[in-house]
UniProtKB/Swiss-Prot annotation:
Annotated function: This reaction introduces a second double bond into the aromatic ring system.
Reactions accelerated catalytically: 5-O-(1-carboxyvinyl)-3-phosphoshikimate = chorismate + phosphate
UniProt cross-references to InterPro entries, sorted A to Z: Chorismate_synth, Chorismate_synth_AroC_sf, Chorismate_synthase_CS
Listed CDD domains: Chorismate_synthase
Subunit structure, interactors included: Homotetramer.
Protein name, UniProt field: Chorismate synthase
Annotated Gene3D superfamilies: Chorismate synthase AroC (3.60.150.10)
EC class (word): lyase
Taxonomic classification: Bacteria, Bacillati, Bacillota, Clostridia, Lachnospirales
Cofactor binding, note field: Reduced FMN (FMNH(2)).
Amino acid sequence: MAGSSYGNIFKVTTWGESHGKGLGVVVDGVPAGLELCEEDIQIFLNRRKPGQSKFTTPRKEDDTVEILSGVFEGKTTGTPVSMVVWNKNQKSKDYSEIASYYRPGHADFCFDEKYGFRDYRGGGRSSGRETIGRVAAGAIAVKMLSSLGIKFLTYTRSIGPVTINEVNFDAHEIYNNSLYMPDSDAAQKASEYLDECLKSLNSSGGVCECVITGLPVGLGDPVFEKIDANLAKAIMSIGAVKGFEIGDGFDAAKATGLTNNDAFIMMDGAVSKETNHSGGTLGGMTDGSPLIFRAAIKPTPSIAATQHTVNKSGEDIEISIKGRHDPIIVPRAVVVVEAMAAITIADALLMNMGARMDRITDFYKKL
């Protein structure tokens, strides 16, 4: 299977299946000298691990990370950083029935058609647990970028019909509720909505939003390495994501040039913008203002409600999916979205080092 790697210099390769022995990641291109320990990674993995509220799968996994290579005496060595999380609470018997039919909303049919074979236990490679490797790699990227003053604020913007009210936005509230919403009133309404979904054996989708501050001007390259294009690829590669928009996104299509353009102004002796309809990018490069994007996440496809499908013999059947599944993916996806954004920014930053001859000259003059 191709396609398990992402990035150019800061390159991430994930491996493992939901019900295999474990899952992990190899991260190439991590600069030497970054202080790093397993706790730095664990903090991020704890944000995505299951069993933390009634709105996540009851599958209990510690998701404890082990760093296998690339770190010595508390610092990265510049060699590949390899990490693993061992699976401990697989219940593969919950999935024995689905080997013979195709679950609506899942990749079962496509896997069978493409490869002629699939690991049906928990979705195998297409399981949400694949994101463990992404989050572990993203934790490294976030630590690397935070040392440069680049910060990430990622949260749940909406769940089903419930959207946060900008007037009530409180960043401190994000970690005060299990839905990671920066609006306590919206979080309460969303919880009530999800309770109804659970009662009706159904699930819900939602939207994650990410705001990145402290970015320099010029990350990303015009044409095929645009920062917004690479972010779109990174975010859309997350299994449940079905849409991506940056800045005003699709609303820009309803605007005029005069209302959509961000006027430039001088502020504190530097070029700035009056507004940020562009979401922090121009011409495929960061423009120094906050980079803002959103990811639309579909409802969990594994639901207990009766659904129509077909089996591998081509017969029409009805199914009710058993097992341990999230009624909503969004809260656990928040950190995955942040991780993929950080990986993309870290890669763009390292690629940017060779953009100008004067920077290369200045560097080598010091040697």
